[in-house]
Amino acid sequence: MLTINSDAKLKDLLEFPCSFTYKVMGHAKPELPELVLEVIQRHAPGDYSPTVKPSAKGNYHSVSINITATSIEQVETLYKELGEIDIVRMVL
């Protein structure tokens, strides 16, 4: 989760609207990309083509998705909600 200091720094670095990529890592379950897209669509509707890559041992998958972010609040909300998905272990 972002802290107040990192929020201020992130806000200063970004000029909205901007392209923003989320990388979501979770258990290698077939529903992972669908769950990620469901959260993204709630806050940034669009036509997305996420990239899914397996880990070396195949236990985890990473889902990368690029959105057009419109505000720092949207970025923070997506980090929070993507991290709340049960099978997700990390959001970058």
Swiss-Prot record:
<dbReference type="GO" id="GO:0005829">
    <property type="term" value="C:cytosol"/>
</dbReference>
<comment type="similarity">
    <text>Belongs to the UPF0250 family.</text>
</comment>
<dbReference type="InterPro" id="IPR007454">
    <property type="entry name" value="UPF0250_YbeD-like"/>
</dbReference>
<protein>
    <recommendedName>
        <fullName>UPF0250 protein VIBHAR_01213</fullName>
    </recommendedName>
</protein>
<dbReference type="InterPro" id="IPR027471">
    <property type="entry name" value="YbeD-like_sf"/>
</dbReference>
<dbReference type="Pfam" id="PF04359">
    <property type="entry name" value="DUF493"/>
</dbReference>
